[in-house]
Amino acid sequence: MKKSIIIVLLFGFQLASAQKSNYSELIAKSGDKIEQKVIAWRHDIHQNPELGNREFRTAELITKHLQSLGIEVQTKVGITGVVGILKGDKPGPVIALRADMDALPVEETNGLPFASKVKTMYNGKETSVMHACGHDGHVAVLMGVAEVLAGMKKDLKGTVKFIFQPAEEGAPIGEEGGAYLMVKEGVLENPKVDVIFGLHMDSQVEVGNLTYRPGGTLAGVGDFKITVKGKPSHGSKPWFSVDPILVASQIVVSLQQIVSRNVKITDNAAVVTVGAINGGNRSNIIPAQVEMLGDVRAFTNEDETLIYSRIKQIAEKTAEAAGATALVELPYGVKYPVTFNNIELTNLMLPTLQKSAGVGNVFLVPANTGAEDFSFYAQKVPGLFFRLGGMPKGKDAKTAPPHHTPEFIIDDASFKLGVITFCNLVFDYAEMNKK
């Protein structure tokens, strides 16, 4: 009797392994077949970039493609967002895949034959627009994934939600947007999402490689604004003034001591940056006030609270000592939480990443002080966010143009691995979490 049970269990395990191997092989072949389509979509989107909450053409392209596959489509989610819902023929979990759609106000100078020449109005000024962060690749990859999975619908366990998100780089002034707004409008409900996966192109990781980190992988970020009010005077008679420029300068220098002297950096990194100082308009007039804008990046709530407290204390006390005042607003605007990769989920899906790229091409990396609004999804449901190498083979990561710069380049050869990895994550997770 025991021997029979063991044989049955062994047969079941072998059958499951064979089925898993079969769909992985089919996904790999499908990745080969769809690669040129994905590249063509990427070129089209790259040549026609759109800023946050204005991704009308991109959304229309996505919508038509999903509808052609017979996928249920919801439009205008979070202003310009598109959500596709693919129901497999077998019961299983609800798995979300996310791609962001927006471009940046950057003039492209990398010489690509499909480089952007688009110009638009941004903050009242005409500006060039460029996909300088790889979001064109994200969209093209997820469009490819949708086509592959739609073709495997009869074998698909559960439901896949394709989330095409606007405004990851931030909504226009005075508007809500991005993942925050999509979550607010219920993108993770109806049907309720069990788990979410996201990827990001990386121009300084070689094509064919994936990188990941369990736990806090990207920093939480919150902006701050400090308004220093002093007393104006003629520049020739500074003794009649309380100089807000001098006070602001002292505050900037003192803020840099927070990370080096107050944060336990052996546990987690943190960053305090002042990115803008505005005050005065003539060389011989000491102005009445100065405004400063900056941001804080941290990986724990404790560090964030500490840094905010010290910013307020330093600004107010420095100003008071000089006879000025400092109004501190923090967080100022939308605050992004830490992008946290669920540790159990990350460990569970690591073999899938390794299967997709090859064991030797998947790398554990340190936490990154960049920020991502994927964090709003991962706050609500278990999430895994990983990076997809986009640097041409043979290039030096130290000299590869970074994200958000005019020379930024992502190699077309990178996208097939993105398609394969997303598809494998869906099938492997569904296989391990049958309902």
Which role fits each region the language model picked out?
Residues 19-130, 140-157:
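Acidic/His- and Gly-rich active-site-bordering loop/insert found
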Residues 108-119, 215-219, 393-401:
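Short, flexible, mixed-charge acidic loops at enzyme active sites
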Residues 118-130, 136-137, 148-276, 281-285:
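Histidine/acidic-residue-rich, glycine-tolerant segments that coordinate divalent metal ions
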